[in-house]
Design a protein with these regions (language model features):
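Transmembrane signal-anchor hairpin modules in multi-pass inner-membrane enzymes, especially those
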Residues: 1-88, 116-117, 123, 187-199, ...
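Loop-to-helix entry and N-terminal half of a specific, functionally important transmembrane alpha helix
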Residues: 21-29, 71, 204, 336, ...
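Transmembrane alpha-helical segments and their membrane-water interfaces
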Residues: 31, 51-61, 83-136, 169, ...
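Transmembrane alpha-helices of multi-pass inner-membrane enzymes
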Residues: 46-51, 228, 360, 378-388, ...
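Hydrophobic transmembrane alpha-helices and their immediate junctions
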Residues: 54, 233, 244, 348-385
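Alpha-helical transmembrane segments of multi-pass inner-membrane proteins
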Residues: 118-151, 167-237, 257-261, 367, ...
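A membrane-periplasm/extracellular boundary helix in multi-pass inner-membrane enzymes
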Residues: 215, 235-282, 297-305, 313, ...
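Long extracytoplasmic/lumenal interhelical loops at the membrane interface
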Residues: 282-297, 301, 305, 309-349
Length: 445
């Protein structure tokens, strides 16, 4: 019996030490989200090991489930899991579920996440995006090469003309747009008290915006312009005229700068015009925008015959191939997904699954914490997600991890019996050391 107790029991003091360590690791995880999927996966593996070693699962799951949003994340995951039972393309289904498994991460995160770490986690993600931006500038100014390999191990790989080092240009610009919007909001509501951090935030907003103009991710531009309006509305919602004036002024200034001084932005606007002309005049959909339009068209055709429960988690592209192989055979070679999450989910798991997904987003948008700033950051991130889901992706390693981690941090409302020190120079150095270790692990995996 004593042996069983030793195996099954761990002291409360040690449990609290593990909880503190897991919170610190989640800070590292957040920093790595925009930088290295393999490195952040290694961090999560360590968190999972600590979660298992801490034991006492029932009590900690009770703490996690005190947050009503958790059940909606899990419910959406279970819908896709159920969709596996009637799918034919199991390989595609397994690939999708490997990404969608992040939906159940809040079950683990909320079982240890202390609310005092919430903004530290958010700040870590912001600094991760800042690091990515700095590397992007170093590549753009040809201070470092566009590709960096150490032996057979890839550090990053991009091009001088579109220097998004760690993510593709769409994801890179989305990350910048979200961080710019969050920082503008925090400055407007005076959430950042330290004068040096205020100056740093203002510099980051400026350089991040300029960096976006160097990158060819059109989705990021749209997300940024719409989020600017949202941020101003959240801050000045009682003064609607002021909202429109400030929002339109900022958006107009940004647009004029990009259109007149950004070759990449100008090129992407011209590309969009040419794509649209080609679709209208020549019925040619073999272009960036055209492929999204034609893929959406065939996805709608799939939905028409399978609107209730869909075709299964992995069968959407297979069904699109069947419908398009005679008239538009190039589609299946050029696109790997419908490029519209709303249509994709409708095709995968039908109107039932779609309703559950939208219910999850609705519950997140209307969720109230004890802090208005948290509520509004949740709104900024959720609205951004709902926007980039239209032409882009959500169930990917970057987008879903970003969404789940930051939302978990913002909705966390529990204080564990742990001592949380303010972040100082020494603790920042420790974070940097741990980040470097996990980056090395990620690179060599």
């Amino acid at each position: 019996m004593n042996l069983i107790n030793k195996i099954c029991y761990i002291s409360k003091e040690n449990q609290n030490k593990i909880i503190l360590l897991m919170n610190h690791l989640l800070v590292v995880y957040a920093f790595l989200i925009p930088i290295s999927n393999k490195a952040k996966t290694s961090v999560f593996f360590c968190i999972l090991l600590l979660f298992l070693y801490r034991r006492n699962f029932i009590d900690y799951f009770k703490i996690a489930f005190k947050n009503e949003l958790l059940k909606y994340f899990i419910l959406l995951y279970l819908v896709f899991l159920l969709g596996m039972s009637y799918t034919n393309d199991m390989d595609a289904a397994y690939i999708f579920m490997n990404k969608a498994k992040v939906l159940i991460y809040p079950l683990i995160f909320l079982s240890f996440l202390d609310m005092r770490f919430s903004f530290r986690i958010l700040n870590a993600f912001i600094f991760g995006v800042l690091f990515s931006e700095i590397v992007s500038y170093l590549i753009h100014f040809q201070i470092i090469p566009p590709e960096l390999f150490i032996g057979e191990y890839k550090i990053y790989q991009t091009v001088y003309t579109d220097p998004a080092p760690f993510l593709n240009h769409i994801k890179h610009n989305i990350a910048l747009a979200i961080v710019i919007s969050v920082l503008i909001y925090r400055l407007l509501v005076n959430d950042i008290k330290n004068i040096y951090l205020k100056i740093l935030s203002f510099i980051f907003i400026t350089t991040a915006f300029i960096n976006m103009s160097l990158i060819g991710g059109r989705t990021g531009y749209i997300v940024l312009f719409l989020l600017i309006f949202l941020v101003v509305f959240l801050v000045y919602r009682q003064k609607i005229k002021k909202v429109f004036f400030i929002s339109l002024s900022i958006i107009l200034i940004m647009f004029m700068y990009m259109y007149n001084f950004s070759k990449q932005f100008d090129k992407r606007v011209e590309d969009a015009k040419n794509d649209i002309k080609s679709m209208i005049n020549e019925k040619n959909y073999d272009s960036s925008i055209g492929l999204r339009i034609i893929a959406s068209y065939y996805t709608i055709e799939v939905i028409k015959d399978n609107y209730l429960v869909g075709v299964g988690t992995g069968d959407v592209m297979q069904e699109i191939q069947k419908l398009s192989k005679d008239k538009d055979p190039y589609i299946i070679k050029r696109v790997k997904s419908p490029h519209n999450i709303y249509l994709q989910v409708l095709a995968q798991v039908g109107i039932i699954g779609f309703f559950i997904m939208m219910l999850m987003f609705y519950k997140i948008l209307t969720y109230k914490t004890l802090d208005k700033k948290r509520d509004n950051i949740i709104k900024i991130l959720t609205i951004a997600t709902l926007i980039f889901m239209i032409p882009g992706n959500f169930f990917e390693f970057f987008e879903l991890a970003m969404f789940v981690t930051i939302i978990s941090a913002m909705i966390s409302n529990y204080k564990f019996d742990i001592f949380v020190k303010e972040a100082d120079f020494k603790s920042i150095l420790k974070y940097i050391l741990v980040i470097i270790i996990f980056l090395i692990i990620g690179i060599t995996k």
